[in-house]
Amino acid sequence: MTDYIEEIEEQDDDTGQLYEHLRIVVDKGQVPVRIDRFMTERLQHSSRNRIQKAADAGFVHVNERPVKSNYKVRPGDVITLMLDRPHHDTTIEAEDIPLDVVYEDDALMVVNKLAGMVVHPGAGNFHGTLINAVAWHLRNMPSFDANDPEVGLVHRIDKDTSGLLVVAKTPEAKRKLGLQFFNKTTHRSYNALVWANFAEDEGRIEGNIGRDPRDRLRMAVFPPDSETGKPAVTHYRVLERFGYVTFVECILETGRTHQIRAHMKHIGHPMFGDERYGGTEILRGERSSTYKAYIQNCFKLCPRQALHARTLGFVHPTTGQQMDFTSPLPQDMEQLLDKWRNYIKGLAV
């Protein structure tokens, strides 16, 4: 049985994936054979050398433990691995686009992505992306080539999500950072404004995430024990309540495509302004024309899903030092929260 696992970080549907994640359960009748040979025979698009490189880098696990390429598979083994995606045909050109650099050294840079910017060239978005801006920023660094898959973005966030991303300048940095995402040792938290009030102050959402059979542009949530979708866990904590909407912090335990957006929709709290997941409907509040006009003004103030990648933490790939970064809320979300605070104050008068 072969189970294809989603990438390590949320991504927009109009961009390609950074990595290919796979999960394979070895059949009961399988005879012992080297894992590099076993995987090559099952993945027609992958060479044996590609599998060996992944194993050497620590990206091949059996029963949750890293193994080398000479490991011999056994019946019932659960194999998980991460492979670099074959490089795209699109040539990445350096473009003079403003870039908000939060931190930079010889090995990496942390950037604060604006909402509305695609992270990587893909179908319909060949220019104006974050990596085009990175290529310009690093144009005087001879060792960095934006077209080299061994450097560059380590993870992604959606086009209309703002916030922190880490970019690797060297192959070693990308390999070590990628391994941290693979092993789930990074820390990432998001701030979001969602519809409706919560009965509790914090909670945990567990549910597999896979393509919505009714809409291929959306993800849907399936039971945790289902064979459909990929395991996903989101933790949330209420930061501020506005009656009809709630400001929350979300912490990723996994990182599936549209994970926070799909999970919040699933528990009845769609992201405010998230058109794809029903967040542009007036889901809570009054029926008056005044209230409806107020909500429409809110949507205009923040014309996207109100989701921001607030914090990012990882171990530096060269120094071994813990690195933690925080990005302030962007202006559109800050103004949106202020508008709701003023609205609630008006109700209290």
Task: Show which residues each predicted segment covers.
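RNA pseudouridine synthases
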Residues: 1-349
